[in-house]
Amino acid sequence: MRISLVLMSLCVFCCTADAGVLNFTGPFDVANWTQAMTNGGDGSFDLTNAPLSVTLFGSDNGFAPIASDTRFSITPTTGWFIGFDWQYSTADFSPFWDPAGYSINGVFTQLSNDAGSQSQSGQVRNLLIVPGDVFAFEQRSRDSAVGRAQMTISSFSATVSSFSATVPEPASFIPVAVGFAAFGVRAFRRRRATQTR
């Protein structure tokens, strides 16, 4: 009985153990991300503090309202849960004109608050990215004028469970086999004990 419990605990521990990435390293190294500006914007990126943080600067080159995005994107080949802290500021009249956030496959999720202060911050945790998703940090500008906004991403982390990988490693099946063996031994002993009574 005790051996079965130990084996089951070991199985649960091994199956839920995560491979982790801290900051912009490994598969999330800044060299693996794509930098893009849309619609002729003059946004930019500051990677000098990488791997600890990256900063996206929005566009501010328009004399007429021109929407433009500054986008920092990656397409992982493995499923990940990611987390990060974000800090935002704008020199525009209002955060409304320069929303910041992230997108998954082009679907934008705004983090900055249009009605909030010129400086804002927050954190995102346990955001699921599945293999093949295009994930991007985005600093948008609705007018590309009157003042530039920026968003800094720090404390980036990513974890992947052995079961969320695209192709499970053979080693990940070992804890499962051990768990099934423990249940089998326990069931066999119970059945045998019942028959001898």
Predicted regions, residues:
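Positively charged n-region of N-terminal signal peptides that target proteins for export
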Residues: M1-I3, E169
